């Protein structure tokens, strides 16, 4: 045992070609010149424990861009997204082809008011409305044959005209609107002859206005006449109705 300890001691000492000394526990320092030499190297010690991990190194420089990879597989269809905001109005497109003809539409309402009447007898009373009882047209019944007056039911502009036969006497005829004479016609009878007299006028009427003809003056001015061959007529109709 003593021999084995001496051998181990010799192996632990530094070699003869390295001069060392110690300073503190576990620290070997070179020996000064002239120290003891000739010691043999010791046997290698056991490997030490792993040290603590070092800190992360600095980031490296970016590498070169790699080549484009192959397209990936088509993924599953996603959910429907929210409706986006309306886009800007696009440019005007080209004209389309002409469509088919549509069905006839309803026309605008037409206001109608008209009459045309004639005299059946030459017996008339002066200064009274002339009763024209021979009806040519009175579909809207705006002319009253019992009074000889036209009654306005649609406000607007009207045209009135009369054509009378004159025989045996002179005639004076006036057209009235609301008890006011608006137009006068006088014809002087020529003996042994049949005369014709006429008149026409445009009048604006309101609802409820009345228009008629009458002989004015005494009986000697009542030459209004009608028979199977000669007519005396009174006509009126609406040109256009008021829009306001």
Swiss-Prot record:
GO molecular function: cytokine activity; hormone activity; protein homodimerization activity; protein serine/threonine kinase activator activity; sialic acid binding; signaling receptor binding
Annotated site, Not glycosylated, chain positions: 230
Site (Not hydroxylated): 62, 86, 104
Result after altering residue 84 to R: Does not form high molecular weight multimers
SMART domains named among the record's database cross-references: C1Q
4-hydroxyproline sites (modified residues): 44, 47, 53, 71, 76, 91, 95
UniProt modified residues of type 5-hydroxylysine: 33, 65, 68, 77, 101
Post-translational modification as stated in the protein's UniProt record: HMW complexes are more extensively glycosylated than smaller oligomers. Hydroxylation and glycosylation of the lysine residues within the collagen-like domain of adiponectin seem to be critically involved in regulating the formation and/or secretion of HMW complexes and consequently contribute to the insulin-sensitizing activity of adiponectin in hepatocytes. O-glycosylated. Not N-glycosylated. O-linked glycans on hydroxylysines consist of Glc-Gal disaccharides bound to the oxygen atom of post-translationally added hydroxyl groups. Sialylated to varying degrees depending on tissue. Thr-22 appears to be the major site of sialylation. Higher sialylation found in SGBS adipocytes than in HEK fibroblasts. Sialylation is not required neither for heterodimerization nor for secretion. Not sialylated on the glycosylated hydroxylysines. Desialylated forms are rapidly cleared from the circulation.
Regulation: Polymerization and secretion of adiponectin is inhibited by succination of cysteine residues by the Krebs cycle intermediate fumarate, which leads to S-(2-succinyl)cysteine residues.
Effect listed in the UniProt record for changing residue 68 to R: Impaired formation of HMW multimers
Annotated phenotype, changing residue 21 to A: Some loss of sialylated isoforms
Reported effect, residue 164 to T: In ADPOD; does not assemble into trimers resulting in impaired secretion from the cell
Glycosylated residues (UniProt): 21-22, 65, 68, 77, 101
Subcellular location: Secreted
Pfam families hit by this protein: C1q (PF00386), Collagen (PF01391)
Tissue expr: Synthesized exclusively by adipocytes and secreted into plasma.
Cellular component per GO, a single term: collagen-containing extracellular matrix
Residue numbers of S-(2-succinyl)cysteine PTMs: 36
Source superkingdom: Eukaryota
Notes on the domains: The C1q domain is commonly called the globular domain.
Further remarks about this protein from its record: HMW-complex blood contents are higher in females than in males, are increased in males by castration and decreased again upon subsequent testosterone treatment, which blocks HMW-complex secretion. In type 2 diabetic patients, both the ratios of HMW to total adiponectin and the degree of adiponectin glycosylation are significantly decreased as compared with healthy controls.
Quaternary assembly: Homomultimer. Forms trimers, hexamers and 12- to 18-mers. The trimers (low molecular weight complexes / LMW) are assembled via non-covalent interactions of the collagen-like domains in a triple helix and hydrophobic interactions within the globular C1q domain. Several trimers can associate to form disulfide-linked hexamers (middle molecular weight complexes / MMW) and larger complexes (higher molecular weight / HMW). The HMW-complex assembly is also modulated by the degree of lysine hydroxylation and glycosylation.
Official protein name in the record: Adiponectin
Taxonomic placement: Eukaryota, Metazoa, Chordata, Craniata, Vertebrata
């Amino acid at each position: 045992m003593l021999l084995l300890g001496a051998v181990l001691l010799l192996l632990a000492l530094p070699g003869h070609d390295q001069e060392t000394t110690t300073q503190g526990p576990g620290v070997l320092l070179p020996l000064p010149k002239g120290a003891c030499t000739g010691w043999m190297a010791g046997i290698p010690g056991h490997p030490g424990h792993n040290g603590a991990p070092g800190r992360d190194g600095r980031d490296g420089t970016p590498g070169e861009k790699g080549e484009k990879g192959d397209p990936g597989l088509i993924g599953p269809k996603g959910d429907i997204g929210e409706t986006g905001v309306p886009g800007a109005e696009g440019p005007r497109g080209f004209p389309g082809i002409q469509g088919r003809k549509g069905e006839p539409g309803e026309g605008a309402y037409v206001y109608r008011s008209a009459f045309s009447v004639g005299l059946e007898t030459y017996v008339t009373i002066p200064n009274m409305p002339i009763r024209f009882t021979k009806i040519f047209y009175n579909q809207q019944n705006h002319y009253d044959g019992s009074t000889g007056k036209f009654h306005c039911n649609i406000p607007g502009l009207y045209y009135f005209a009369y054509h009378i036969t004159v025989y045996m006497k002179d005639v004076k005829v006036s057209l009235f609107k609301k008890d006011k004479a608006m137009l006068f016609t006088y014809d002087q009878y020529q003996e042994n002859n049949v005369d014709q007299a006429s008149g026409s006028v445009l009048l604006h009427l309101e609802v409820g206005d009345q228009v008629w003809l009458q002989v004015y003056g005494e009986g000697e001015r009542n030459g209004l006449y009608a028979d199977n061959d000669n007519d005396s007529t009174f006509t009126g109709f609406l040109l256009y109705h008021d829009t306001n």
